[in-house]
Amino acid sequence: MLDKLGQNLSEALNKIKNATFVDKKLVKEVIKDIQKALIQSDVNVKLVFNMSKEIERKAIEEAPPKGLSKKEHIVKIVYDELVKLLGETIQKLELDASKKSVILLIGIQGSGKTTSAAKLARYIQKKGLRPGLIAADVYRPAAYQQLKQLSEKINVPLFGDETRTKTPVDITKEGMEKLKKVDVIIIDTAGRHKEEEGLLAEMKEMKDLTNPNEIILVIDGTLGQQAKNQAKAFKDSVSEIGSILVTKLDGSAKGGGALSAVAEINAPIKFIGTGEGVDNLEQFDPKKFISRILGFGDLDSLLEKTEDIMDESAEESIDSILKGKFTLIELYAQLETISKMGPMKQILSMIPGMGGNMPKEAAQLTEDKLKRYKIMMDSMTMEEKENPELIKTSRLQRIARGAGVKPEEIKDLLKYYSTTKNAFGNLKRGKMPKMGGQMGQIMRQLMYKD
């Protein structure tokens, strides 16, 4: 998994950060660790060694710029070279809100294309545009049903042929007519292989029919550096591929290899799939991506994610907190907001110092604890939620029985509530909680067993 890559790279860089003296021998040792981490993530050996030479040359020959120590300069060199490995610049999906856009999704069967179609629709929806979906894959029996379920979940119109008696070209033609009121049409085409000439000819016909603004190739991140061959084959067959969407990065040990391989052939990666949910699609930003992997965090993305899921009740809760009111009702609302943000590992990776070295078990424990805390609060009366100080021995035992937990776990929740309340109290007084202080205490209590 990519968190394993992040952990290995962070451990390598920590040798620099924790060293009393940085010499050529230490630089070479750290570079060997970086090489091992990247090769284990299936990054091409030649790319790794070329990058290593550049890191070594700059680390030994370059003087640190003003304001940076030697250690900081070497860490920055590694960061810059890793970013370069993944393509450096952000490739944005450009859509003109004043006219209808068409996106054609292509890729090999099993790459996650149908799920990606729904994720892309959700992404566009969050940008304030109205997406529509066309299910043009008549070859895979479950394709229409899968896209139907996903489209209903995100409230996006779908056109397709459940009977699978029409051709993909006819379905697309009818769908273009039916979806006149949407801003962006996303077409999920049949999965294919480069040797299937008939399917490639059909795709060309669909391309001519729809005149798409963008053709997005969906590639399975678990392929590792083999993704290069697949991307190149499609690029040669369909010369107008606009961009790449790499899926399944959350569960692949070869994700780094897939990303670097695609970047190597200058095929712009615009999106990455980071989980199974419809909201788990991100615009690919090499700098933010490497920053999160190395444990430097990505506060911009964290804020964006928070804004995306903030509803009226969450905003009311924050208003109450800022006015000095923080009961278990406000805590419950905050836990609900965190739950909607996605996998805990992903959220914590956006917080500086939390991502690169955090064990997977700790993230899982955090997620489990959040769920259990909510179950415990569901067993409380409204009076108890508004006045947690009322929860003494008899009430505590009743709540524990109702939630199916031990009384000690209710005490753990109340301790967490107290810590969080104090932190918010300081925030209200203009003091920013530090990761090593109260904020660290909050995160540690969630992440580790007592």
From Swiss-Prot:
Keyword terms, alphabetized: Cytoplasm, GTP-binding, Hydrolase, Nucleotide-binding, Ribonucleoprotein, RNA-binding, Signal recognition particle
Keyword Cytoplasm: yes
GO terms (BP aspect): SRP-dependent cotranslational protein targeting to membrane
The enzyme's E.C. designation: 3.6.5.4
Swiss-Prot/TrEMBL catalytic activity: GTP + H2O = GDP + phosphate + H(+)
Broad class of enzyme this protein falls into: hydrolase
Sequence positions that bind GTP: 107-114, 188-192, 247-250
Subcellular location: Cytoplasm
A GO-annotated cellular component: signal recognition particle
Principal location: cytoplasm
GO molecular function, one term: 7S RNA binding
Family recorded in the similarity comment: Belongs to the GTP-binding SRP family. SRP54 subfamily.
Domain notes: Composed of three domains: the N-terminal N domain, which is responsible for interactions with the ribosome, the central G domain, which binds GTP, and the C-terminal M domain, which binds the RNA and the signal sequence of the RNC.
Subunit structure: Part of the signal recognition particle protein translocation system, which is composed of SRP and FtsY. Archaeal SRP consists of a 7S RNA molecule of 300 nucleotides and two protein subunits: SRP54 and SRP19.
Function: Involved in targeting and insertion of nascent membrane proteins into the cytoplasmic membrane. Binds to the hydrophobic signal sequence of the ribosome-nascent chain (RNC) as it emerges from the ribosomes. The SRP-RNC complex is then targeted to the cytoplasmic membrane where it interacts with the SRP receptor FtsY.
Name of protein: Signal recognition particle 54 kDa protein
